[in-house]
């Protein structure tokens, strides 16, 4: 007897504007319930304090969420100088207070030092795991554990405002960059300490900022649909972006039907003119239907790596 599905097989990416005070997983579960989705996953957690872009993958799109985890991010951050907290943000307790004697010239010079590649040691208050447990679980018990530094790249860091003890910046960075750690390090460089008071993610990969929707907007759409006798999916599904937007930076290889069928059955295929290495976005036919991601193997063939499972429309 077939197991009954819990949810419907809906595929795509919704760009949620996560509210402050909510964990990324809580936001994910709310979206999953609204869409009555069979599967859902987010593409990189935001701190509860933070707001902004949280791409949520539904259905088959979850297979490609790793590509968004690995993508560049953009943030706007406000930092308060003169106070250091145990979490490096305003959710934590103040552990040190120092006078602020910072000039604009000194601030700009210190900010400039973060540009480029560097080694960053993650905060103890992060979701990274040590011996199977998130670091923040140790931190909340006052336990500090060893953390390995990680290579990060800050492509752009721009000072937008410096008023009194407040600093507002915009950061374009690689995956795995902790903005709280940048702010904490900046405070130490300035000799006064600092912590994050506002953090907003404004960009993930190339997703457009204007396509974000809030939970309030989604709930309102559902309420209006129910009131008007319309199925919620009719108003929610048009907000989804295609699942292949998660891999749009990969080179495309368009396959004829016979080769696509071979790939969908797990076989590697030879394609003239295909790139000689790396991962590829695979499409099929004149309509360029996305079928998954392949990778060039040692034999110069395209081997399937992650494939879309197509289901009958329900």
Swiss-Prot record:
Gene Ontology molecular function terms on file: RNA binding; tRNA pseudouridine(55) synthase activity
Tagged with keyword Kinase: no
Protein family (similarity comment): Belongs to the pseudouridine synthase TruB family. Type 1 subfamily.
The protein's enzyme class: isomerase
UniProt xrefs under NCBIfam families: TruB (TIGR00431)
Catalytic reactions on record: uridine(55) in tRNA = pseudouridine(55) in tRNA
Active-site residues from the entry: 47
HAMAP family with a match to the protein in the record: TruB_bact (MF_01080)
Function: Responsible for synthesis of pseudouridine from uracil-55 in the psi GC loop of transfer RNAs.
GO BP: any one term: tRNA pseudouridine synthesis
UniProt keyword Isomerase, yes or no: yes
UniProt KW keywords: Isomerase, tRNA processing
The protein, known as: tRNA pseudouridine synthase B
The organism of origin for this protein: Vibrio vulnificus (strain YJ016)
Record gene name: truB
EC number of this enzyme: 5.4.99.25
């Amino acid at each position: 007897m077939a197991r009954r599905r819990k949810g419907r097989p809906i595929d795509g990416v919704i760009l949620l504007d996560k509210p402050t005070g909510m964990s990324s997983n809580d936001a994910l579960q709310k979206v999953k319930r609204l869409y009555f989705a069979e599967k859902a996953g987010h593409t990189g957690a935001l701190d509860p304090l933070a707001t902004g872009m949280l791409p949520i993958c539904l259905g088959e799109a979850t297979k490609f969420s790793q590509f968004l985890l690995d993508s560049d991010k953009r943030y706007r951050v406000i930092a308060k100088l003169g106070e250091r907290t145990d979490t490096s943000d305003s959710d934590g307790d103040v552990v040190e207070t120092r006078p602020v004697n910072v000039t604009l010239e000194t601030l700009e010079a210190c900010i400039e030092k973060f540009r480029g590649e560097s080694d960053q040691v993650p905060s103890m208050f992060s979701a990274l795991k040590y011996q199977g447990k998130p670091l923040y679980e140790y931190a909340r018990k006052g336990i500090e554990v060893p953390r390995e530094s990680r290579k990060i790249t800050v492509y752009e860091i721009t000072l937008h405002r410096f008023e009194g003890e407040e600093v507002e910046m915009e950061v374009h960075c690689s995956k795995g960059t902790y903005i709280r750690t940048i702010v904490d390090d900046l405070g130490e460089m300035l000799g006064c300490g600092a912590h994050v008071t506002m953090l907003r993610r404004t960009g993930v990969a190339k997703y457009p900022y204007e396509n974000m929707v809030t939970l309030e907007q989604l709930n309102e759409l559902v309420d209006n649909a129910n009131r008007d006798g319309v199925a919620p999916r009719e108003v929610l599904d048009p907000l989804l972006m295609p699942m292949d937007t998660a891999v749009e930076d990969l080179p495309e290889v368009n396959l004829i039907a016979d080769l696509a069928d071979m790939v969908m059955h797990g076989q590697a295929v030879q394609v003239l003119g295909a790139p000689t290495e790396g991962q590829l976005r695979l499409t099929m036919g004149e309509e360029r239907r996305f079928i998954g991601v392949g990778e060039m193997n040692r034999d110069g063939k395209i081997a399937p790596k992650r494939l879309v499972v197509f289901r009958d429309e329900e």
